[in-house]
From Swiss-Prot:
Stretches that traverse the bilayer: 7-27, 222-242
EC number of the protein: 1.-.-.-
Annotated InterPro entries: Cyt_P450 (IPR001128), Cyt_P450_E_grp-IV (IPR002403), Cyt_P450_sf (IPR036396), Cytochrome_P450_monoxygenase (IPR050121)
The protein's enzyme class: oxidoreductase
Entry annotated with the keyword Metal-binding: yes
Pfam families given in the database record: p450
NAD in keyword set: no
Membrane topology reported for the UniProt record: Multi-pass membrane protein
Cofactor: heme
Binding site for heme: C475
UniProt-recorded name of the protein: Cytochrome P450 monooxygenase claO
GO molecular function, one term: iron ion binding
């Protein structure tokens, strides 16, 4: 290419970029004109806004949002990347309205959809509107109470397989054995979703190598460079940047390849079993429903691409997002910090189940302190700290209490212009002192047993929590995660006592380890490790 042509091409490129930026500016000004002008924190960076501060620098994003809500009211504006802004709502009435319009009135941002598509494909997490409703309806029978009841034995089987491995380890040093509990919770989650969802045993509890687990875990083994972080944050405005070959983006592609390969193998095996009658495929199992949807000539039909994407989603959810592994790890951390609460839970469990295991019904309704511990962990440690969506249409969001706008006007609702980014700070709402009291940041399961508890809490999510979100996108696997969490924890606490391995059981600092989603880790450990001293309960 001649120099003149290079200059001409460069000028055209600059002109196109200018037009693109101009169109974005006009669109942003239009949205601002239709959106109620709200107060909010000052911008810290023209490039990142407050996005980097919230997602990278702040120790507790929930506490940050809570402080802003106290200063600016139940809805406020937060500066984003390249001069953009987001509306954050910390009001129960507003949040209920927001979640009720999910997949239609409020949809995922282009970056979120690109990220989801890159990781798992065009499945339930990616879809919106009628496509989301169709896919969710096709999968719902696999997560009914009847289905979870049948799967409870799988969770106990995995628990006892882990117990056998731990007992073998404890034989050599019964009083001073330290075990990285997070690693074993990873194994339980992967094997349970494999058997319960796909009739496939990954064998990680038996020490078998799993490519899927290795790729999942590799997300937490790299320290993202400044360049990678910049690309990830700028992708909020320019989703196409997710295609650049950064370490993180390459890992995403590798994860998608491995999960899709495994999904293809499991699907093909199940099809052959069904056709040749060499095995039995339960039609209401996850993989059975997917096979049924593939052949159905009804509104619930799913394409091959959608089916593989659903399996990728289930592997991701079962191992990472709503997996009980993170909940279980946090439960063992909190119970090690609070030995008296650990003893109280053990007493409840052993008073009823010394030689047998509780049924699904008993796990759900017959063990009040276990239920309280589980829900206190869900409250304090949601795996997803916030959700943001884009308004697909102009909207009016009602508020339960008035706020003062940027112009000084007092309003009881806020206008949202089409294209505005709106978010809910889940961790903030779950830990809000306004909703949960002055001890909201403390691990206190007893709060769930107090008379009248929750009567003044207007949050409409599961048990007044937003951990599983709410509305049309409520986590489909909530019952699965709760049953697995309770079953595994009931075995662990009956069979073992846990404490931190430092002198006198001293509590170390628990840090946030970055992976696909944050995981807990003990300060000073290499990777996402949570070592605890484990002893048998006599």
């Amino acid at each position: 290419m001649t120099p003149a042509r290079e200059i001409g091409a460069f000028n055209i490129l600059v002109f196109l970029i200018f037009l693109w930026l101009l169109s974005k500016l006009v669109g942003r000004l239009g949205r601002r004109g239709r959106t109620t002008p709200l107060r909010g924190p000052a911008n810290k960076s023209l490039l990142f806004g407050l996005t980097r501060y919230i997602n990278v620098e702040a120790d507790d994003s929930g506490a940050v949002y809570e402080s802003w809500a106290a200063e600016y009211g139940p809805a406020f504006r937060v500066p984003g990347v390249l001069g953009s802004h987001r509306i954050v709502i910390c009001d129960a009435k507003a949040i209920a309205h927001f979640y009720s319009k999910e997949t239609f009135g409020y949809v995922q941002s282009p970056r979120a959809r690109s990220t989801i598509k890159n990781i798992v494909g065009r499945g339930l997490l990616w879809s919106e509107g009628e496509s989301h409703r169709r896919q969710r309806k096709a999968l719902s029978p696999a997560f009914s109470n009847a289905a979870i009841r049948r799967l409870t034995s799988v969770f106990f089987d995995s628990s006892y397989k882990m117990k056998a491995a731990w007992d073998s380890i404890l034989e050599t040093n019964p009083d001073n054995t330290v075990i990285d509990v997070q690693k074993w919770m990873n194994h339980i989650s992967l094997d349970s979703i494999g058997i319960a969802g796909f009739s496939h045993d990954f064998g990680s509890l038996d020490g078998k190598h799993s490519d899927v687990a290795a790729v999942f875990d590799s997300f937490g083994s790299i320290n993202p460079s400044y360049f990678s972080m910049v690309i990830f944050l700028l992708a909020l405005v320019f989703p196409i940047l997710l295609k650049l070959p950064t370490n993180r983006n390459l890992l995403v592609l590798k994860l998608r390849e491995r999960t899709s390969e495994i999904a293809d193998v499991l699907l093909e095996r199940t099809r052959k079993e069904k056709e040749g009658r060499t095995g039995t495929v339960e039609e209401k199992s996850i993989i059975g429903l997917l096979i049924k949807a593939e052949s159905a000539e009804t509104e619930l039909h799913m394409s091959q691409e959608e089916i593989v994407a659903q399996m990728n989603v289930l592997l991701l959810a079962g191992y990472e997002t709503t997996s009980s592994k993170t909940f279980l790890t946090w439960a063992l951390i909190e119970l090690s910090k609070n030995p008296e609460k650990q003893a109280k839970l053990r007493e409840e469990l052993l008073s009823q189940y010394t030689t047998t295991d509780p049924t699904w019904e008993q796990l759900a309704n017959g063990l009040p302190y276990l239920d309280s511990v589980v829900h206190e962990i869900l409250r304090l440690h949601p795996p997803v700290g916030e959700t943001f969506r884009v308004a697909a249409e102009d909207d009016i969001i009602p508020l339960s209490r008035p706020l003062v706008t940027l112009s000084g006007q007092t309003v009881s609702s806020i206008a949202i212009g089409k294209g505005t980014m709106v978010g809910v700070p889940i961790r903030c709402m779950n830990r809000s002192e306004v909703l949960w009291g002055k001890d909201a940041k403390e691990f206190r399961p007893e709060r769930w047993l107090e008379p009248g508890f929750g009567e003044n809490n207007e949050v409409q999510g599961h048990r007044h929590l937003l951990t599983f979100i709410d509305g049309p996108r409520t986590c489909l696997g909530r019952g699965f995660a709760l049953a697995e969490f309770k079953a595994v924890l009931s075995v662990l606490i009956r069979k073992y006592a846990f404490e931190f391995p430092g002198p006198g059981g001293a509590v170390p600092k628990i840090e946030k380890h970055r992976s696909i989603l944050p995981r807990p880790k003990v300060e000073g450990q290499d990777g996402a490790k949570v070592p605890l001293r484990v002893r048998r309960v006599e």
